[in-house]
Amino acid sequence: MMTTMTRTNSNHPVLIDCDTGIDDALALIYLAGLAAAGEVQLRAVTTTAGNVDATQTALNSAHILRLCGLPNVPVVAGVPTPLVVPLVTTPETHGPHGLGYVIPPETSTDTIAVTPGERPDTVPVGVPAAATGGDERGRRHRA
């Protein structure tokens, strides 16, 4: 039996929340490719602390987006460190900026001011938990 697949230009709006280190940089590059192909509209990136604080992950995200030709996608840093447990970083493994030993240039990030309970736009949220070693509740797995 032969199956024919047709590709539709669905152009889904996407907001991604990530802790942009090496793995999430690859996820952003993949999303940039989907955006270039017209498959998604990358509306915004929000960042959390991971191997570095959320401010650095926002700078990393802005750098990757700029390299991918998407400098106008808003990037918003979340809480700079975890709320419950201390932030544990491993610069000897992930480098001082979380991108291995790539040193991103200083980048200002766009911010979105949102009143709690108010949404500027409704978009599906993509959380690359499997790619970041977290689970569905955002808990990090440690080896």
Model features per residue range: what roles?
Residues 1-143:
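N-terminal acidic, glycine/proline-rich low-complexity segments
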